[in-house]
Amino acid sequence: MQGDVRLAVDQGARAIGLIDGAFEYVAPVWHKEILYGLSKGVAVFGAASMGALRAAECHAFGMIGIGEIFAAYASEIRVDDADVALLHGPKELGYIAITVPMVNVDATIAGCCTRGLISAREARHLKESARSLFFKARSWNAVVANCSEIASGRANELLRILRHNYVDQKNADAMALIDALRHADAYSPPTHFEFNRTSLWRDD
């Protein structure tokens, strides 16, 4: 949440990994605090979700992006912030995922298509169906049910294929970031910019 990165920097962190945040109800990590950390020589990594978004936005200042999702945003192949959003359960249930983020939909469908489990036509229709759904309503059941171009006799088979071959790209990228943090000492962020205080940023 907003302020966490600044607090970590002020407490002496030398490397910070940013993965996810809570959408809608909690203020996310601010770009300014990331720049603050970079200006102090702290290696700041981002991946998977909010971390990938911030890394794509702050890469030019030295933030280190990790993974496929970051690469897609950095190259502007992917532009919608909501593509990483999902609905999850409460802390008591381990924040279990209830819906499927678009980045995982795309990765899963691409994998199934590459292995010949679904056709290019089915892949296209499934992606269109998934993208038309609000992130809080995007489950595999909803994606397939919302896809009118899929014959009813094929729907159950598609659902089985998608679930059995699910690719959790967010998790894969998050694990890659954790691995990168183990070698964080090898990174030294460039400080080719001047960090400017503003009316919204004070040192006290």
Predicted features along the sequence, with ranges:
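Metabolite-binding pocket within alpha/beta catalytic cores that recognizes anionic/polar moieties
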Residues: 3-81
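Accessory terminal and edge-of-domain segments that mediate assembly/interaction
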Residues: 1-17, 26, 31, 87-204
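Residues forming well-ordered secondary-structure scaffolds
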Residues: 64, 79-82, 100-107
